[in-house]
């Protein structure tokens, strides 16, 4: 309204001097309580641990109500909604040519991890590899060790059982790793200290039935971690679950013929 003062009031009130005063800009609608709670954790997942148990539980309930994309780029689970809510789904990996990737990996003294996809929903596994590498959102897969992106540490062969389309990456300096053993202990403490929040998480979780998939990802991210490692020791084929692609340096190279017994590439 303010920018149209001349046409709205020019025939009277404009001739005397300073012209019509600009109308005040309309006030933005007040945020709801749910919106305020969600705003606190966006980019700051640890904020939920500073809330009262009731506020944290209500935040979990609010997350469970959030919309997700329905074009196949996101998963219809609580973990996907949670990673969206804290801003983890939007980050991207460092993506390098294969030669630059190998130089960076050797300099960092890291081991390649392998992720495999299969054809699904009318799209090829290669399409999903590309989404992981450079898509504007991350698909949070289901799994026993937390919802996120699953990798086989140091074993292309172990990864191949999940699809013949394969990509690779290593954990960079932004990775913060926590083990499932640590999360189990953390979960027992959390459920005792935050019973309402824990109950809300149990109610909200979807994925692998009665597993701690939702609790693992929630606890890891809220305590400052973005990678979950199965068990306390890494051996070839150990499951690694990334919650945030910024923890990854990836090669642009992909393959379409992954199979059991293959060598690492």
Protein language model features and the residues they cover:
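Active-site and NAD+-binding cores of ADP-ribose-processing enzymes
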Residues: 34-150, 161-265
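Gram-negative host-targeted secretion-system effectors, predominantly Type III and Type IV
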Residues: 27-35
């Amino acid at each position: 309204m303010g920018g149209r003062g001349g046409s709205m009031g020019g025939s009277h009130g404009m001739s005397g001097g300073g012209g019509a005063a600009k109308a005040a800009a309309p006030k933005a609608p007040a945020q709801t309580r749910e919106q305020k709670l969600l705003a606190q954790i966006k980019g700051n997942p640890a904020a939920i641990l500073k809330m009262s148990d009731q506020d944290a539980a209500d935040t979990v309930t609010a997350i469970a109500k959030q919309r997700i994309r329905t074009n196949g780029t996101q998963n219809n689970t609580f973990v996907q909604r949670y990673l969206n809510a804290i801003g983890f789904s939007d980050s991207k990996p460092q993506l390098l040519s294969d030669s630059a990737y190998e130089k960076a990996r050797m300099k960092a003294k890291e081991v390649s991890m392998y992720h495999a996809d299969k054809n699904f929903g009318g799209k090829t596994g290669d399409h999903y590899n590309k989404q992981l590498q450079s898509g504007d959102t991350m698909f949070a897969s289901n799994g026993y060790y937390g919802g996120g992106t699953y990798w086989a540490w140091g074993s292309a062969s172990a990864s191949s059982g999940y699809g013949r389309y394969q990509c690779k990456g290593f954990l960079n300096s932004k990775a913060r790793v926590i083990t499932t053993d640590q999360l189990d202990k953390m979960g027992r403490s959390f459920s005792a200290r935050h019973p309402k929040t824990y109950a809300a998480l149990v109610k909200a979780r979807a994925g692998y039935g009665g597993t701690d998939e939702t609790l693992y990802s929630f606890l890891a991210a809220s305590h400052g971690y973005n990678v979950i490692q199965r068990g306390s020791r890494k051996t070839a084929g150990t499951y690694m679950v990334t919650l945030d692609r910024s923890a990854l340096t990836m090669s642009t190279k992909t393959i379409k013929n992954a199979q059991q017994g293959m060598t690492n590439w």
